[in-house]
Amino acid sequence: MADRLISTEPATGAEVWSGEIGDAAREVAAARAAWPEWAAHSVAYRCEALRRFANEVRAREKDFADTIARETGKPYWEARTEVGSVINKVEISINAYSERTPQRKVEAALGNKVAVRHKPHGVLAVLGPYNFPAHLPNGHIVPALLAGNAVVFKP
């Protein structure tokens, strides 16, 4: 088995990037160890962290689009659109979270009142597809992080 993962450009066979093959158990353990601290942060803090992420992607938009286009073989305009979707997903998720997860009290059976609260669950695994390597996984990663979960991502 190889020690490194190498991504090649379909059109030319040139190496796009390479990296060490990770140890999944080690990565899950690291995420599990980091999760309590991340989950303890307020939703406002997590929103701000995700907005900083979106700004970092925006600042490197051309580089990300270049990498996606080279690695997948898709047209550059489509790769740019994918990167835009990655950026926009942050605000979409923040708005959806605010609308769908407020703490609220509701009437229950027999006249009882119950409180509905949302809480983080732990570590989530996200597997990325080859055809939309940033946009589709990001659609799971951003909401999971916003909700206070940790994520292990396998591109």
List the predicted regions and their residue ranges:
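Nucleotide-sugar donor-binding loop of glycosyltransferases
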Residues: P155
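Short, structured beta/alpha segment
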Residues: M1-R70, I92
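A short hydrophobic/small-residue beta-strand
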Residues: A150-V152
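N-terminal Rossmann NAD(P)-binding subdomain characteristic of aldehyde/semialdehyde dehydrogenases
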Residues: L50-I141
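Short hydrophobic alpha-helices that are characteristic scaffold elements of the AMP-binding
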Residues: L145-L146
